[in-house]
Structures are given as structure tokens and as C-alpha cells.
């Protein structure tokens, strides 16, 4: 309730109203005032910043809302909103192209698992485009966290500040690790979606299909990793790509690569 006092001289009136919306609880499938809810106590709902706390993430999971049959719904990690201003694809698989569209359809689909009948039963709030644009303007103020060892223009390591293993990791990142083919500096993403075809390694599983490239800026602060949180640590994430892309990195290569990513 103190957002106005904290930000009234820092944000524009439009951004302040967007922040108000991001902090306002709205009914959701599991958290609402009806008897059909998951929580023991009835509530007005949840806010955007309940999961994206301070514009970052609490690392909570949910199931994607738009897959049918429902047993094929997959787990999704809550991503950080840091650096959202510089991202052109929103939603791991839905490929929404604006923050405004994502903010609107998050309420209409994800909040009620894509079931419009449940939505109206439990109190869906229909946001107009003015409200949505205010929310988007506030979200577009969220910047990447500081990275003191990176050159502010190129996004590459400053060799005067970086350690030897961090510099070796950078060389692997842009070389045999093939990381930069998708994670392009200075934002370390390419605004595209890619299919790793992990079904090659599974039996009777359809795989994930195309998943958007997530930024690696500030990656050390937002475990677990990958779109569904299957990698608990950066080390796990490096090993995942080492196996899927058949990179054959050595143990030292992987340590150096993690050291580099911790500076992003």
C-alpha cells in the first residue's frame, strides 16, 4: 500500500497507475473468493508482483494454460521481468509480440487455465487497452541488474576487471559452446524461438516444441533454469546443453562457462 509514497517523484502518473495495477489482486483459478479454490481462505486473488516480486521472480511454477488435452500441459517457471523493455517475444510458447498483449491475455488465459467459463464464475477482470498500456509502461521501466564486469556498450567482459577463468568461459561461450548463436550480446538473447528437439533422447514423448530464447543477463539471480525449471543450477543448465547439443565440454570448460555467466 506504500507504492505511491515510494515512487511518486520517480515515476510518471501513467507509470504509477501501471504499478497500481501490477499490485492489485485479481481473482485467479486457484485463488479467489468462491468455494472452488485451492487456498484454504478466500481471497480477492493474486497480484502480478506476487510472483514477479519487485519486477523479478519468486521462482514459482505453474502449468501452461493453453495445451489440450490437459495431461499434456507442461510446467513453466516464473521468469524475471528484468530487462523486459528490450524483449520482443513474451510467453515461453505463445509468442506474443508485445507487453500489452501479454498483460491482457495473461488475465484471460493463464489466470484461469484458458477456461473462460471458470473465469466469469470466479470474477475475471476484463482490462481495457488503456489499463493494459499503463501496466506495460511500468513493466518497460524494469532494467537489467548491474553487471560491473561487462562493457556497457558491447556487453562483453572488460579484460581489466575479469578473472582468467571468466575470460576462458567467455571464449567458450562465443566459441565451441555455441551459446552466442542464440544468446547474443549485449542483451544475450536473439528475440527468436528455437526447438531443441529433446524428444530425440526420450521415448514416447513429444518434446517441448519451439521455446523462446530467454535473456542471460542477471541469470545468476533467477534459479531454477530453462523454461520449466528442470535445471536447478547453472551447472545443471550447462550440462543439459552439453548433452543435448553434444558439445563434449571438459569439466574445466564447464566450470569456466559458469564463471562467465555469473558475471552477466
Label each region the model flagged:
Residues 1-264:
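Periplasmic c-type cytochrome electron-transfer domains
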